[in-house]
């Protein structure tokens, strides 16, 4: 379950007016206040995939998600800033991702899943995962108690461990990211 995950607004730079003025610079023109004409231009730019002006405004978010989700997120971005909680500097709190249900691997398409496990197998899968999480976190704590540095103790933690980061991206990059995500849902 992703109940521990969140995405929250932190800050922004620029506005819709920044975007339309970035587009208008091509014609040595600028707008000082928002008009309906600006709204039409903004829509035109996006609808016709003239997206470079959207690079002139950005938004920062605080995100908490399992490490494997954050790594997939980072894989699909260009020109974005990313700062993540460091397991070198902080002790990681216990918290792991648990799937709502388990899917079967598609035998023909290595990138797909199909159907669901039986109820008995679902229960067994959850037990196996819980055992691994508990052991991994107990071992992490024991390594820290032994004096092992956090940088090395963290290697026993699974990628289902939750982490937090600040992500800043241009509005163009955010829209591209969201479109890619929608295409894979």
Predicted regions and their residues:
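Family-specific signature for flavin-dependent thymidylate synthase
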Residues: 1-183
């Amino acid at each position: 379950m992703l109940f521990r995950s969140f995405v929250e607004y932190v800050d922004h730079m620029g506005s819709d007016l920044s975007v339309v003025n970035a587009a208008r610079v091509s014609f040595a023109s600028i707008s000082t206040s928002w008009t309906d004409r600006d709204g039409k231009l903004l829509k035109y730019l996006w609808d016709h995939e003239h997206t470079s002006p959207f690079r002139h405004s950005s938004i920062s978010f605080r995100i908490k998600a399992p490490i494997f989700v954050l790594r997939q997120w980072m894989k699909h971005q260009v020109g974005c800033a990313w700062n993540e909680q460091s397991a070198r500097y902080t002790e990681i709190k216990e918290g792991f991702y648990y799937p709502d249900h388990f899917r079967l691997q598609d035998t023909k398409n290595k990138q797909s899943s199909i159907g669901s496990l039986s109820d008995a197998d679902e229960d067994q899968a959850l037990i196996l995962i819980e055992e691994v999480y508990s052991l991994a976190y107990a071992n992490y704590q024991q390594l820290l108690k032994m004096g092992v540095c956090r940088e090395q103790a963290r290697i026993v933690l699974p990628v289902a461990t939750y982490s937090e980061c600040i992500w800043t991206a241009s509005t163009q990059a955010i829209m591209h990211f969201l479109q890619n995500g929608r295409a894979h849902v």
